[in-house]
Amino acid sequence: MASVIGYYGTGRRKTAVARVYLRPGDGKVKVNGKEYESLNDYFKNIAWTKHAIEPLEVTNTIGKFDLVIRVNGGGLSGQAGAVRLGIARALLQYDENLKPVLKKYKMLTRDPREVERKKYGLKKARRAPQFSKR
């Protein structure tokens, strides 16, 4: 059984987790088992799509790989960030020489910001109930 050459990267953002497989090809996109013309058909927002494929753009590898992505959790914004990190990490497996370019654009950094939990006695994480002196 011949194994298909591919590159793998995991990305996380907020509560979203993306597992990204890059395979040499002509730019086909498959997200959660469903074929798409482009990532824009999945994200439905050009800003999220641009954010997700940014690693391919800055390394001039757009159209060189077929993307197979499994993403779950979070919303579309968090998923786009997770896909972005996953693609960047997979590109590093493909070519270690891309590291300075990806690092320059801060694509190898996991965004640590998470939603702060709500505390009892408060309306939200930090918003206290209105205070009245009299």
UniProtKB/Swiss-Prot annotation:
GO terms under cellular component: cytosolic small ribosomal subunit
Give the InterPro entries listed for this entry.
Ribosomal_Su5_D2-typ_SF, Ribosomal_uS9, Ribosomal_uS9_bac/plastid, Ribosomal_uS9_CS, Ribsml_uS5_D2-typ_fold_subgr
> Mind telling me which Gene3D superfamilies this protein's record contains?
3.30.230.10
Keyword Ribosomal protein, does the record have it? yes
Single Gene Ontology BP annotation: translation
**Keywords for this protein:** Ribonucleoprotein, Ribosomal protein
Any GO MF annotation of the entry: structural constituent of ribosome
* Pfam families for this protein: Ribosomal_S9 (PF00380)
Q: What is this protein called?
A: Small ribosomal subunit protein uS9
